[in-house]
């Protein structure tokens, strides 16, 4: 990879401003069902293939799946998961932080937290993490490492929701991935919530809102 080609990639240039960067992002903060998944990544080698990486929300599912394999090849990757039970117990923000800490803990090339700067998507630092952190609002559109973490987290979670769809075919998890679509809410009303799959606190709020609409 020629330096002039690297200079054309603003996402990579952002990461170059810091020494030893880790990108962290999550997927699944807003759904009514399923876990929250966080990913932490460290770039091993920059290749031209990585120029296709962008914010996971702007990519098609097929494109994310393709980039997932490219990222796994070029980054050291770890994933952390917080369960529905943990989300209900801790609240979604703290469950988010827990998933992120788990991902960071499992990064094989992270030997000393103090040698790295964690670039985390959003405006908050990860609670109870001792290493240096830099929260970046809309970081998945600014940093290559955060964008890569975003894709890993999203693809991993989508796959988990498809697995749940095989177990509970009446809920169409493979389509809405646990989000509060009309189809999903109607399935919950008709068939009930699934213990350990649906988030009780989230459901209470959404069903109360739906009830208000009918008054």
Swiss-Prot record:
Keywords: Cytoplasm, Endonuclease, Hydrolase, Manganese, Metal-binding, Nuclease. Gene3D superfamilies: Ribonuclease H-like superfamily/Ribonuclease H. The keyword Ligase does not apply. GO terms for cellular component: cytoplasm; ribonuclease H2 complex. Signal peptide: none annotated. SUPFAM superfamilies: Ribonuclease H-like. One of its GO terms (molecular function) is manganese ion binding. One of its GO terms (biological process) is DNA replication, removal of RNA primer. A divalent metal cation binds at residues 25-26, 121. It is found in: Cytoplasm. Its main location: cytoplasm. Manganese or magnesium. Binds 1 divalent metal ion per monomer in the absence of substrate. May bind a second metal ion after substrate binding. It comes from the Bacteria. Residues 19-214 form the RNase H type-2 domain. Its EC number is 3.1.26.4. Its cofactor is Mn(2+); Mg(2+). It catalyses: Endonucleolytic cleavage to 5'-phosphomonoester. Belongs to the RNase HII family. Endonuclease that specifically degrades the RNA of RNA-DNA hybrids. This is Ribonuclease HII. It comes from Fusobacterium nucleatum subsp. nucleatum (strain ATCC 25586 / DSM 15643 / BCRC 10681 / CIP 101130 / JCM 8532 / KCTC 2640 / LMG 13131 / VPI 4355).
